[in-house]
Amino acid sequence: MDFSPSSELGFHFVAFILLTRHRTAFPASGKKRETDYSDGDPLDVHKRLPSSAGEDRAVMLGFAMMGFSVLMFFLLGTTILKPFMLSIQREESTCTAIHTDIMDDWLDCAFTCGVHCHGQGKYPCLQVFVNLSHPGQKALLHYNEEAVQINPKCFYTPKCHQDRNDLLNSALDIKEFFDHKNGTPFSCFYSPASQSEDVILIKKYDQMAIFHCLFWPSLTLLGGALIVGMVRLTQHLSLLCEKYSTVVRDEVGGKVPYIEQHQFKLCIMRRSKGRAEKS
């Protein structure tokens, strides 16, 4: 049986195949377009891509880092920044020790000797009186800002424990040190705006400590925000890529029936031309 394009039967056979392919391909393409654009919202199915487990963990890590940095800002701000702001208000001056004294009444303190062990003890209160050269007044000397906050009556607050002799010997050593410096000027810090007679020997927090208190929490906050931002950017780029791929597939699918229809028309024109030549 002759199925060549020049025969009548071959012509009908080729035409039937092209029409069948055209009808099966075109409704499928139309159905896909109807699914994508039925509600007037193009590509609504691909608005949000499912995130992977790694992306979810990365986002959780970023938010955890940001929360931890906020907690660090709060803790360091209350424990270091606040005393530092009070410390920078103090100006340097020259002090001269007048006399030292250990109070007769020891002060109460608490200590821990284990997980569930707590005890009560007492420690000697050492007082160091100095003379400020700049204001020219008598003042009570403290070791640092923390000693002023814990007990403003004493030079320092030792670590509490049960050995009273050790606590007393430590206080006597400090008393002997200032007794030898009697009449010798040394540097100290006082607050001009405060009416209190409290001066400190050294500053506990310097500029470098404040730098670390602000740098590391800020770096943690920036790192967490960068992780979350990179994950969101990756998801957004994946979404754009998926949308672009879908649009390209739709365009290619719409061109296939048109090409087949054009081939069918060329076949009809050749058949008509062949009949005209025979007649």
From Swiss-Prot:
Ranges in the topological domain labelled Cytoplasmic: 1-60, 229-279
PTM characteristics: N-glycosylated. The extracellular domain contains disulfide bond essential for the gating mechanism.
MF terms in GO: calcium-activated potassium channel activity; potassium channel regulator activity
Tissue: Isoform 1, isoform 3 and isoform 4 are widely expressed. Isoform 2 is expressed placenta, pancreas, kidney and heart. Isoform 1 and isoform 3 are highly expressed in pancreas and testis.
Primary role: Regulatory subunit of the calcium activated potassium KCNMA1 (maxiK) channel. Modulates the calcium sensitivity and gating kinetics of KCNMA1, thereby contributing to KCNMA1 channel diversity. Alters the functional properties of the current expressed by the KCNMA1 channel. Isoform 2, isoform 3 and isoform 4 partially inactivate the current of KCNBMA. Isoform 4 induces a fast and incomplete inactivation of KCNMA1 channel that is detectable only at large depolarizations. In contrast, isoform 1 does not induce detectable inactivation of KCNMA1.
Family membership: Belongs to the KCNMB (TC 8.A.14.1) family. KCNMB3 subfamily.
Name of this chain's protein: Calcium-activated potassium channel subunit beta-3
Organism: Homo sapiens (Human)
